[in-house]
From Swiss-Prot:
Nuclease among keywords: yes
Function noted in UniProt: Toxic component of a type II toxin-antitoxin (TA) system. An RNase. Involved in plasmid stability.
Protein residues bound to Mg(2+): D5, D104
Species the sequence originates in: Sinorhizobium fredii (strain NBRC 101917 / NGR234)
Protein's name in the database: VapC ribonuclease Y4jK
Gene Ontology terms, MF aspect: magnesium ion binding; RNA nuclease activity
Domain of life: Bacteria
Database matches in Pfam families: PIN (PF01850)
């Protein structure tokens, strides 16, 4: 099972998404793909911070009308198990001299709590958290 990081969803919304990312997404079985509630929060914040207009409306419709319905039942909450994983992985990263941002830490902890990997372009914080990662921008 794979948790999609925010940058994967954002890439799909570009006027010309990276072909490798499109090919990777197309090769996945939809039921193996998940989002973290933190990713949804990041996407919603990004949209709320955009100037009002057609572009923002299009992206809001994509998130609320396409992405979330397609992943219904597969948006993972940040719960008590994730909070335990967060504390452990952030402490381990700090001890190792590695830095993980809070949002990436929450996403990583959610994935760890469920035994999932993360698909992302920004691999370093998730590697620092000890997760198995997939970079859809790179050939397999």
């Amino acid at each position: 099972m794979i948790v999609l990081d925010t940058n994967v969803i954002s890439e799909l919304w570009k006027a010309e998404p990276d072909r490798a990312v499109l090919a990777w997404i197309d090769a996945q079985m939809i039921e193996t793909l998940y989002l973290s509630a933190i990713t949804v929060a990041e996407l919603r914040f990004g949209l709320a911070a955009m100037p009002a207009g057609k572009r923002r409306t299009i992206f809001q419709n994509r998130l609320e009308g396409e992405v979330l319905p397609a992943l219904a039942g597969r948006v993972l909450p940040f719960d008590l198990d994730a909070s335990r994983s967060y504390a452990d992985l952030m402490a381990q990263a700090k001890t190792s001299g590695k830095v993980i941002g809070k949002a990436d830490g929450y996403i990583a902890a959610t994935a760890v709590a469920h035994g999932f990997m993360v698909a992302t372009r920004d691999t370093s914080p998730f590697e620092a958290a000890g997760l198995d990662i997939i970079n859809p921008w790179e050939p397999a």
